[in-house]
Amino acid sequence: MAQPGTSASSSSAVSFETALLLLATLTAFAANSILCRLALAGGHIDALTFTSVRLLSGAVVLTLVLVAKSRQPVIAIDPPAMLALMVYALAFSVSYIGLAAGVGALLLFGAVQVTMLSVGLYRGERLSAQAWFGFALAVAGLVTYLLPGKASAPMGAVAAMLLAGCAWGVYSLRGARGQDPVAATTSNFLAAAPLTVALAVIFGSGWHITTEGMVLAALSGGLTSGLGYVLWYHVVKKIPALTAATVQLSVPILAAFGGVVILGEPLTSRLAFAGVAVLGGIALVVKGRQGTVAAASAKPAQQSGAVVREQWIYGAGI
């Protein structure tokens, strides 16, 4: 993968083909929430089995992609990343037993970004006033949605999705260290899948499996996760860095739209307010961090790569 800081200039135009691929990728990420909600809320499969099938099918598709590119899959296991992937995938599944698709996607997105930004601050990253304001706005949006009330979501499901977001934030930061994200993602899927299956065998006393549930889980793992990741890692090399970070804001919106149209879920004023606050806040953070990095005098290219790469890796998580 090309260095993020040099993959596309901030002024370069995005071709029509790239725009279509980008739209397909973002739709795939949003579809993960729809497929999971369809499978679990509909009672077609239990969460542990769904997670196992999702990771297995993702591992198969990612391996086939590497083989098709005449590359020998090499398993280079990163234990913390593998564990984070497992926690993310399982918590993601559990949460959608009780969360609407749009709500889950928004909580996941917010938790990932807050986790990654918090780690950045701990490591000494400095934010502009605009980025700080955006961070506070995003956190306020999440807190506002989580306040008790008639429209509040089940707290157990909310906690599971926040855990999934924190885990994916950790996975993203681990992935930011590598140079070949497709190979790294394949390795982590190959390592996590059998362990998750083992957990399902050991602890899955409440198995509930239907053909429809298996198909939905396989689509989530192989199509919207596996192929979605490959498309994302391909398309980010062709678009400006700020665009790559910003377009991810559309994923929760697409998921909420899909939930309303496909699943018949309500779009509440509470969710709309939280969505505007969280997505608007993250947009300010992205823009503010970009400006801070561009203005830095010490090793600007490396700093830009570190910030942008984290944003790019996250895109594979929804």
How would you describe each model-predicted region?
Residues 1-52, 87-91, 140, 150-177, ...:
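Glycine-/small-residue-enriched transmembrane alpha-helix faces in small-molecule transporters
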Residues 62, 85, 127-147, 164-166, ...:
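Hydrophobic transmembrane alpha-helices of multi-pass small-molecule transport proteins
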